[in-house]
Amino acid sequence: MQKETFEVEYEYEGERLDKYVSILFPEQSRSFFQKLIKDGNVSVNDKVQKANYRLKTEDLVTVEIPDAVETQILPEDIPLDILYEDDDLLVVNKPKGMVVPPSAGHYSGTLVNAIMYHCKDSLSGINGEIRPGIVHRIDMDTTGSLIVCKNDESHVFIAEQIKEHSVNRRYRGIVYGVVRDDEGTIHAPIGRHPVDRKKMAINEKNGKDAITHYKVLERFDKYTYMEFKLETGRTHQIRVHMASIGHPLLGDTLYSNGKSPYKLQGQTLHAMTIGFIHPGTREYMEISAPLPEYFEKILRDLR
């Protein structure tokens, strides 16, 4: 365990505890220290405080960082469709049916297993979790572009952009029904479903702010081909928002009772493009993943 004590200088008078500690250890994220504080690993004058505690000059802040728990997830030689790669990160085109981080019932065949094999020891280890390199995720049955970070510095840099909603994330999807408006915005908070814990739902009371912009690309007799742009990245955001306006995603059995004429494995949703400031060059870059063949086949059939 790493343990260090710092005396607060005058310039940090009134600073929040979590922000102060994240300044001391810039290689880690602020959320990392918020969890550390919540777990009682940060004290002020030998007393555990909350993350929003305001510091005073000459306060003694003690930080205890537990040793990272060795992951039990094993590398697996799973082919990856790599759209871009350098020393700081890679962008992969995730296939349908692949889980991103390991979870109950999915400890093998995940994206983490694949990138551990591909990158060896070159993956970020933020929070010491069993999800090395993973800075964001997409649902198991959603395909498309996803960033993987190779070191903690790039992880923190990309995570901060995601937190500030400055990452450009555009999706393509096919929904049930004919969407009337050419474009629009859905601004509705999303939280856990009150009854079905597998689902998310519009939750005005306890939900987190969620904003989805949409644009119609093509209309068919019973379906609409659309583009979505996310301002926020809540769990199942596009799926919940579109279902809330009566146009759930084709194949999405969790949020729709609609019958699909196609044999689908989950929702017809693809993370088409991701744009961000590169942590090394500090320049904006944009990576796009081509539509998967099953998606193209449905479009050809509808046309």
PLM features: residue spans?
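Short, surface-exposed secondary-structure edge patches
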Residues: 50-54, 227, 266
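Conserved hydrophobic positions within beta-strands
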Residues: 82, 175, 213-216, 249
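The conserved catalytic core of RNA pseudouridine synthases
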Residues: 128-160, 168, 172, 187, ...
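Active-site-adjacent capping/gating segments
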Residues: 263-271
